[in-house]
């Protein structure tokens, strides 16, 4: 029996599945329309890290993020800090922007994003207008409610600043992805299983015929 058609179908299904899974395993995915999905944190970043074009105090920055409508989504916010990590501390990777800084951009303590401006860092180059400066987080600093958390992309430090006097940048995010998770992955794996089972059965029948000769 000619197995070539089945083998071609099987090879094609494997190739398609591998391509999809490589995309699914990517940490940062450009979803288009100015949005970058972070599959590890399950949040979507604005591609433009300075969409407002100006520094703002904390309350204005909150209001700016809340008023955004990008890609038909209007549930934007400022990034979350990591209060447990502490004040004036490096390597706070539970901080959403800290995770991006250390884990996705691969930067280290005291190393700023300016070191990536002219480089070939693929993750960093997904974004535009990233400032080597201070970005507000979306939460107050509980021990001193006149202050709010921020993250400094010039040094990688998490700290807090006065909500009214501090003029920093805002970088908006939203929870979750901006596209529906496709069912193709499950269907492809199921299809591969069926193709593999069919191939095994055909090979078994061929061996049985040969053994009967």
Positions of PLM-derived features:
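Bacterial N-terminal signal peptides that target proteins for export
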Residues: 2-11
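Bacterial N-terminal signal peptides
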Residues: 11-19
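Sec/Tat signal peptide C-region and signal peptidase I cleavage site
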Residues: 20-26
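Extracellular adhesion/carbohydrate-recognition regions
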Residues: 27-77, 167-173
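An exposed tryptophan-centered "aromatic clamp" motif
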Residues: 62, 66-73, 81-150
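Short, structured beta-strand segments at or near domain termini in extracellular proteins/domains
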Residues: 162-180
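A short, hydrophobic C-terminal helix/tail in secreted or cell-surface proteins
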Residues: 182-201
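C-terminal membrane-anchoring or membrane-association module
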Residues: 198-213
């Amino acid at each position: 029996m000619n197995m070539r058609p089945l083998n071609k179908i099987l090879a094609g299904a494997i190739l398609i599945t591998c391509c999809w899974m490589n995309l699914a395993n990517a940490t940062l995915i450009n979803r288009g329309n100015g949005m970058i999905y972070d599959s590890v944190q399950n949040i979507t970043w604005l591609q433009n890290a300075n969409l407002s074009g100006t520094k703002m105090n904390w309350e204005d920055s909150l209001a700016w993020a809340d008023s955004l409508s990008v890609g038909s989504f209007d549930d934007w916010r400022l990034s979350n800090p990591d209060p447990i990590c502490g004040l004036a501390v490096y390597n706070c990777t539970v901080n959403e922007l800290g995770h991006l800084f250390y884990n996705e951009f691969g930067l280290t303590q005291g190393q700023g994003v300016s070191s990536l401006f002219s480089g070939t860092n693929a993750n960093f180059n997904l974004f535009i207008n990233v400032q080597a400066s201070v970005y507000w987080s979306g939460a107050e600093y509980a021990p001193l409610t006149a202050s709010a958390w921020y993250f400094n992309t010039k040094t990688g430090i998490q700290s807090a600043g006065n909500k009214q006097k501090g003029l920093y940048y805002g970088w908006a995010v939203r929870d979750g992805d901006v596209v529906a998770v496709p069912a193709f992955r499950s269907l492809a794996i199921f299809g591969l299983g069926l193709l593999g089972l069919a191939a095994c059965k055909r090979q078994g029948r061929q061996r049985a015929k040969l053994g009967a000769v």
